Amino acid sequence: MAMTLRDIINKLLRRQPASASTARERLQLVLAHDRSDLSTELLDQMRKEILEVVAKYVEIDVDEGAVSLETEDRMTALVANLPIKRTITGQIQLKEPKNQSELDSPETEGTDQKS
């Protein structure tokens, strides 16, 4: 089957937005990475730790989830898109801080004190 000139033009025009969109997304990712001044190793460690913390509270689909840097209007954000399978109930009780000094104190990290 021979392609007409119109078919060729339509085919070419449909690919351009997809290619341009992909190139733009890649450029935004590179810019976000550069602006954040984070090494690849540090970003990977952050992703791992974020997934571990979220997994304490909800069951997530790690294979479908993503943690990425996104830039929009000169602002870089760390974005986590994590599909939740179900919540985990009754396993963890959160301790509310009594005052600001407890939030700032590294001594209270990892303690299991009850209010």
Swiss-Prot record:
Q: Which residues form a coiled coil?
A: none
Report any one BP term from Gene Ontology.
Answer: cell division
Q: Keywords of this protein's UniProt record, alphabetized? A: Cell cycle, Cell division
Q: Where is this region: Disordered?
A: 93-115
> This protein's superkingdom?
Bacteria
Transmembrane region positions?
A: none
Recorded hits in InterPro entries, A to Z, give:
MinE, MinE_sf
Cystine pairs: none
Claim: Lipid biosynthesis is one of the keywords in the record: no
Compositionally skewed regions (Acidic residues) per UniProt = 104-115
Q: Does the keyword Cell cycle apply?
A: yes
Could you tell me what this protein does?
Answer: Prevents the cell division inhibition by proteins MinC and MinD at internal division sites while permitting inhibition at polar sites. This ensures cell division at the proper site by restricting the formation of a division septum at the midpoint of the long axis of the cell.
Q: Which family does it belong to?
A: Belongs to the MinE family.
State the name under which the record lists this protein. Cell division topological specificity factor
Q: Which organism is it from?
A: Prochlorococcus marinus (strain NATL1A)
Lineage of this protein's species?
Bacteria, Bacillati, Cyanobacteriota, Cyanophyceae, Synechococcales
Identify the gene encoding this protein: minE
